[in-house]
C-alpha cells in the first residue's frame, strides 16, 4: 500500500523544523512512502525545497502561487498525492519511524475509511 504524507510549509524561519519533519517521513520503516511537500506562497521556500528535495523520486513538491492557508494547502497536497492513503503531518512534528507502518496495518487489518492517532513529543 502506497502512503502519501502531505507536509505543508511556508516560511524559512521554520525550515529547520520542516527538514526534521521531512526527514522523519523519509525514514519510515514502511517501504512505499511518498512525501508530498506543499509550499504555501513563498518563492524562497519553494526554491529551497526544490533544491533540497526536488531530485528525489519519493518526494513530490508543489508550490502554491499565493498563500492560501493550511487547510487549502493540505487539500492541494491530497489532490496531487499518488498514494492509496493520504496522511498529514505538521512542519514542526517528527514522525515515529513506524508511524506509517502502523497506519497501513490499521487499514489492512480492519475495514476502515480513516485512521488517526495522537502525536507525542
Which role does the model predict for each range below?
Residues 1-24:
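N-proximal low-complexity "stem/linker" segments adjacent to membrane-targeting elements
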Residues 7, 37-38, 116-118:
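Short beta-strand segments
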Residues 22-63:
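Acidic donor-binding segment of Leloir-type glycosyltransferases
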Residues 64-81:
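Glycine-rich, basic loop-to-helix element that forms the pyrophosphate-binding segment
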Residues 86:
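Short aromatic/hydrophobic "clamp" motif used to bind/position activated sugar donors
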Residues 90-94:
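The conserved acidic donor/metal-binding loop of glycosyltransferases
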Residues 98-121:
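Conserved donor NDP-sugar-binding/catalytic core segment of glycosyltransferases
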Amino acid at each position: 500500500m502506497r502512503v502519501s504524507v502531505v507536509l505543508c510549509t511556508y516560511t524559512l524561519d521554520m525550515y529547520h523544523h520542516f527538514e526534521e519533519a521531512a526527514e522523519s517521513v523519509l525514514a519510515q520503516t514502511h517501504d512505499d512512502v511518498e512525501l508530498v511537500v506543499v509550499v504555501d506562497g513563498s518563492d524562497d521556500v519553494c526554491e529551497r525545497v526544490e533544491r533540497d528535495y526536488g531530485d528525489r523520486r519519493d518526494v513530490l513538491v508543489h508550490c502554491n502561487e499565493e498563500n492560501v492557508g493550511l487547510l487549502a494547502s493540505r487539500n492541494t497536497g491530497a489532490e496531487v498525492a499518488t498514494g492509496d492513503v493520504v496522511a498529514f503531518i505538521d512542519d514542526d512534528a517528527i514522525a515515529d519511524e513506524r508511524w506509517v507502518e502502523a497506519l497501513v496495518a490499521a487499514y489492512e487489518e480492519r475495514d476502515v475509511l480513516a485512521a488517526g492517532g495522537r502525536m507525542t513529543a
